[in-house]
Regions:
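Multi-pass alpha-helical membrane architecture of UbiA-family
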Residues: 1-296
Length: 296
């Protein structure tokens, strides 16, 4: 008797599906988030072993995966109407809703399990963390500064990494958290999001969606973005000095801060693509300054 299975394993199909879903969650953004997480963890002190390093990385990956997939699900009907976002994978039919919900569930599960592996307080805070992340897409429906909500989402990464270094004692964890780095990171992301949202100025105004540009005008949005990014750059430098991270690392920190301010100038000129590329460099230079200061 010959028994055949209707289900076959095709490595090429599996690989193509994995690659497609990784594009859907923009995995490269997660990779650029990790250095800041590890920088915050090391500044918080405690014992960084392989176990902790791996699960901090997995927690970041899981949280961003859940957030990115839910953002696409929640914004589906808006993205269908916006010419700028009509090519997004869920809207374009390259990813199904079933897949999107599956990716969200997987990301949330990876995040919660990683938090549990890191300790008691990371697990307790996993629920509130997810709540902050999944409510972000609705912020622009409610008020004019969803950029601050996105900044908070990003700030959860260095904050969570710091708490993971002292997972059984929340008072010690909060006392050891590099708050200047956390605040600088929040302002960095919020400031750039103000710049990025200018591209949707007319669409947001027509559909009653909130952003600094839509509510207050382009000039005010430019001023807000520059203020946020300049403040962030200043805080990154002050953080370096407060922790006494030394001259060698200070060069990288100053370079990152300078690029951040320059990206703000480019953004106010409408050169968003160039500003975005500079921001990728900022996300590497600031942690590099910290790593160099700690170990060289």
């Amino acid at each position: 008797v010959h028994i055949s299975s209707s289900v076959s394993f095709d490595p090429e199909v599996v690989g193509a599906t994995a690659a497609r879903l990784l594009r859907f969650i923009r995995v490269e953004h997660t990779i650029f988030t990790l250095p800041m997480a590890y920088a915050a963890a090391l500044l918080a002190g405690g014992r960084m072993d392989l176990w902790r390093a791996v699960f901090i990385g997995l927690a970041v990956f899981g949280l961003r995966t859940a957030g990115m997939s839910w953002n696409n699900i929640a914004d589906y009907h808006i993205d269908k109407l916006n010419p700028r976002t009509q090519g997004r994978m869920l809207v374009a039919g390259k990813v199904s809703f079933k897949e999107a919900y599956g990716v969200f569930a997987l990301g949330a599960a990876v995040f919660i399990l990683s938090a549990a592996a890191l300790g008691w307080w990371p697990l307790i805070l996993a629920g509130p963390y997810l709540l902050v992340v999944v409510t972000y897409p609705y912020a622009k429906r409610l008020h004019c500064m969803p950029h601050l909500h996105l900044g908070l989402v990003y700030a959860l990464v260095p904050l969570g990494a710091a708490i993971a270094m002292h997972p059984e004692d929340i008072e010690t964890a909060l006392a050891k958290t590099p708050w200047l780095l956390v605040l600088a990171s929040a302002l960095w992301v919020a400031g750039f999001d103000v710049i990025y949202s200018k591209g949707d100025y007319e669409f947001d105004r027509a559909h009653g969606l909130g952003s600094a540009a839509a509510c207050f005008g382009i000039k005010v949005a430019d001023a807000v973005a520059f203020l946020f990014l300049a403040a962030s750059a200043t805080l990154y430098v002050v953080n370096h000095l407060v922790y006494g991270l030394g001259a060698a690392g200070l060069l990288a920190t100053l370079a990152g801060a300078a690029l951040e301010v320059y990206s703000a100038i480019l953004g106010t000129r409408g050169e968003v693509a160039r500003a975005f590329n500079l921001n990728l460099a900022v996300g590497l230079l600031i942690p590099l300054g910290i790593f160099t200061g700690l170990y060289i």
